[in-house]
Amino acid sequence: MTKKPGGPGKNRAINMLKRGLPRVFPLVGVKRVVMSLLDGRGPVRFVLALITFFKFTALAPTKALLGRWKAVEKSVAMKHLTSFKRELGTLIDAVNKRGRKQNKRGGNEGSIMWLASLAVVIACAGAMKLSNFQGKLLMTINNTDIADVIVIPTSKGENRCWVRAIDVGYMCEDTITYECPKLTMGNDPEDVDCWCDNQEVYVQYGRCTRTRHSKRSRRSVSVQTHGESSLVNKKEAWLDSTKATRYLMKTENWIIRNPGYAFLAAVLGWMLGSNNGQRVVFTILLLLVAPAYSFNCLGMGNRDFIEGASGATWVDLVLEGDSCLTIMANDKPTLDVRMINIEASQLAEVRSYCYHASVTDISTVARCPTTGEAHNEKRADSSYVCKQGFTDRGWGNGCGLFGKGSIDTCAKFSCTSKAIGRTIQPENIKYEVGIFVHGTTTSENHGNYSAQVGASQAAKFTVTPNAPSITLKLGDYGEVTLDCEPRSGLNTEAFYVMTVGSKSFLVHREWFHDLALPWTSPSSTAWRNRELLMEFEGAHATKQSVVALGSQEGGLHQALAGAIVVEYSSSVKLTSGHLKCRLKMDKLALKGTTYGMCTEKFSFAKNPVDTGHGTVVIELSYSGSDGPCKIPIVSVASLNDMTPVGRLVTVNPFVATSSANSKVLVEMEPPFGDSYIVVGRGDKQINHHWHKAGSTLGKAFSTTLKGAQRLAALGDTAWDFGSIGGVFNSIGRAVHQVFGGAFRTLFGGMSWITQGLMGALLLWMGVNARDRSIALAFLATGGVLVFLATNVHADTGCAIDITRKEMRCGSGIFVHNDVEAWVDRYKYLPETPRSLAKIVHKAHKEGVCGVRSVTRLEHQMWEAVRDELNVLLKENAVDLSVVVNKPVGRYRSAPKRLSMTQEKFEMGWKAWGKSILFAPELANSTFVVDGPETKECPDEHRAWNSMQIEDFGFGITSTRVWLKIREESTDECDGAIIGTAVKGHVAVHSDLSYWIESRYNDTWKLERAVFGEVKSCTWPETHTLWGDDVEESELIIPHTIAGPKSKHNRREGYKTQNQGPWDENGIVLDFDYCPGTKVTITEDCSKRGPSVRTTTDSGKLITDWCCRSCSLPPLRFRTENGCWYGMEIRPVMHDETTLVRSQVDAFKGEMVDPFSAGPSGDVSGHPGSPSQEVDGQIDHSCGFGGPTCADAWGYHLH
């Protein structure tokens, strides 16, 4: 029998019927009660008591407690608070009675009172100081005085004051002064932390503590991000974290706009990989590398080789920071030219910004309502910042009336840390350059500058604007002359050197001037905009606290991300910029050419070493003592065939001394692949096997890349230029093409048909090859060859071939052929038609009625996208149509600009397909492109020059040019399609519209100009040759129609042709006689006037012409409608009514032609003195040395 569980409860271990309270430690119970009250739970009276406690101790109650307080009904709250007030009154009465009882107990009442008063005064004197402020009593206290009542004896009796401020610290510069008002009996203090019972006084105390800094504002200054610097720089930019994102975006755009290249890269990547993982990796790497080579040549080579053509006496150099150029020429010693340092001194201070300020000596003056406006006397001190306002006053803070009282707070501003901006003066930039001869150098002297200077194998010099030319003597090697153009390539007017703490940065001028920080000028000590680093906190009845913002150094450093870091102490070392020099080698000579060959044995002192630049350095030890003698050294492909391959960088190496075991360093460039370095003759010959990785095709590609990198470094200020294929003669003259550069280097002399056939042949050989590697190589090479032969490639620069009259932007060719017709292969496209349609809509709402095209290519772009824009406008319910009219005359300018917007219009597939077949109907409102000026859409309401080239794409028949909206307003032409060059005695300024050619014959003068169209933008100075100190009145092609401000745009005897026939089509400006006419120079000829056509309205030829002091042959304009003469050449004795005059005035409204308005008999009309005038020209001596100055510079392609 089993026993049932259970039983009496009393016998169980735990009696469930009589379970007692749990045993809890008393403190734990108290904690639980307090925590529940803090959470707002419990009796109302306890909650209100706890809130009162927090109020008295100036502690912040919890959110739950405040929530319970707000939920208490008004009547309940008033009931409990009234009882609190009664209890407080009882306590006050008890304290007062206690004081009276103690006084009654004393036997000697007068003595005790006197001693007590004396003790109080002594205590006050030890802890408190009394003075005057604003005509009232001022007590200066510390943190020990606020625990008790402060008693101040006055003539009216004791003045008892209570200070309950929580920011009282020890006395320091950070002080605050404000008024303690007088409160009458029975009034509780309200919005004051200091009050007295007899009369008001001012209180002053320091706010410093031993444990922490002064109170600071949590606010920070918003500093605009500096952004990526436009300068090409050798060093990494500061905190530059944006390049990776931008590069990925650039890769995406490149793939979208160059699908042919992207497809080719994907195919190559897929063929290179042996499994899917490798194929994906290779494809991604190729796609990432391709746009870097195509558009943004990252990284700079440390050493470049420049080969001078045979018989050359000079070579143009472009020296960059930390770069070294090795110059090799036939029958000349090899030179190393190194840019050692670019330094700017005597920087002028422009402005200082305060990024860390301190606030001291705060004082507040307050007034009651109806007692007048508060005035703080410290307002008169310029070092103080003051602020006036109003506060609520009443019985609880010392005023008899309730209302708004005036308050005036002042605080002293002082700057703790400041950032200083300095400007670089171009005349204070100096360049330190070193030249080293590849002569006989021992390993001990290699790199030893002092030893090489002693052996006349090296020299160091400084180039400044005041000393741009220098001649260096190199001992037995002769002498070398450098004529340098001291232009750093750094626009000193656009950048400042900004020093923040211990770091200095090169920052944009506009960004620097727009900083929202207090600033001061060097000539002043007063800070402006000081309130940016100060915060006036909320005003209380008689007190207002002022705090300073924390240091903004971190924010500045963050905002400077992308700026270039520079070193600055008393001078700044620049890492951006370049120096153009012409190195004259006519007086250089090889040393040791008459020495005999060394006959004894050589040995390799060390194994040959790769320099990393494709060359090898060999240290040889010579056992003989028959020196000086020449070293027989050569590089051969095979020991059985001693035909030299490769070349010597150290030209004519020799042993300089007759001592045995002398060591010599020799540098040579072996060929790609396997070769042997052979030293010595006969049985004493030694050799060393050498393998050089790479290929000739790869070198051609890297050579082109070098030219692209140099262009990236120089920007638009200088560009070495040579004709197609010139890469074999001068690496520094590589054509700026990337993929196509190597292609044209190897196959540039062939026609595209031959190139295509060769590619097809390689493809056929690849298909039939048995070896897989060879087949893939043939297929890849043939495919690339066919692709490059049949496509027009992309690029970002323009090149000029003067002899072939050819200009290339990308590979699109702009040919000026024998019949002087322009053939272009360019097509302008907007970034996206959807965004352009939205931009047009936005501009129309802002009052822009249309646009004026800058060039005919832009006009063609509007024609091409007109229907698509109209469909987009119609699909988005916009009653507006784009109307493109035929341009009349030259392309005129307009004052307004289109503005960028991030919004886009949307269009469905159905509407897009319909737009291909049908043009949309014309809307009620129109947006007019070009055409004649009308009352409906005058030029003053049109936009112009709103687009700029963003990128170049590719196509089968044309180079695609992608346009984007300009961010800034400018009148300059787009520099992306401009090329400028000097070669020999010919200088050219050219773009897709102009070919302006000048020649040198005793002096430089304009020879010819061909205009595809005439535009109204201004030629940028960055693409202008010889543009120093040019008078606009001497420019034959006016600068208002894109005439370059260059001395190449001049001709003796002629002034600016502002009234030439610029509205005609197909203009060719040259210097010759119009058919069937003659021109004579006579003083009786009439003065300048608008250009006149040589045929009348009826077609009759005007044969006789004259000029006052022009030069012959005369200036003429050949157009589609006939031949015109320049403004100086006038018809002789002809009916004025039948003449066909030019109706153009290229000058703007405020400009006046001074020559047409000159006195009779003076063709020039200019203010030059007779001693200065030569044939109507003012004689200006050339800044570079007279008539040969322009030829003294190799102005190569910009």
UniProtKB/Swiss-Prot annotation:
Disulfide bonds join 297-324, 354-410, 354-415, 368-399, 386-410, 386-415, 484-581, 598-629, 798-809, 849-937, 973-1017, 1074-1123, 1085-1106, 1107-1110. Glycans are attached at residues 142, 448, 924, 1001. Genome polyprotein: Specific enzymatic cleavages in vivo yield mature proteins. Cleavages in the lumen of endoplasmic reticulum are performed by host signal peptidase, whereas cleavages in the cytoplasmic side are performed by serine protease NS3. Signal cleavage at the 2K-4B site requires a prior NS3 protease-mediated cleavage at the 4A-2K site. Signal peptide: none annotated. Pfam families: Flavi_capsid, Flavi_E_stem, Flavi_glycop_C, Flavi_glycoprot, Flavi_M, Flavi_NS1, Flavi_propep. One of its GO terms (cellular component) is viral envelope. GO terms for biological process: clathrin-dependent endocytosis of virus by host cell; fusion of virus membrane with host endosome membrane; viral translational frameshifting; virion attachment to host cell. Keywords: Capsid protein, Clathrin-mediated endocytosis of virus by host, Cleavage on pair of basic residues, Disulfide bond, Fusion of virus membrane with host endosomal membrane, Fusion of virus membrane with host membrane, Glycoprotein, Host endoplasmic reticulum, Host membrane, Host-virus interaction, Membrane, Secreted, Transmembrane, Transmembrane helix, Viral attachment to host cell, Viral envelope protein, Viral penetration into host cytoplasm, Virion, Virus endocytosis by host, Virus entry into host cell. Residues 106-127 form a propeptide. InterPro entries: Env_glycoprot_M_flavivir (IPR000069), Env_glycoprot_M_sf_flavivir (IPR038302), Flav_gly_cen_dom_subdom1 (IPR013755), Flavi_capsidC (IPR001122), Flavi_capsidC_sf (IPR037172), Flavi_E_Ig-like (IPR027287), Flavi_E_Stem/Anchor_dom (IPR026470), Flavi_E_Stem/Anchor_dom_sf (IPR038345). Residues 2-15 are annotated as: Interaction with host EXOC1. Residues 37-72 are annotated as: Hydrophobic. The transmembrane domains of the small envelope protein M and envelope protein E contain an endoplasmic reticulum retention signal. This is Structural polyprotein.
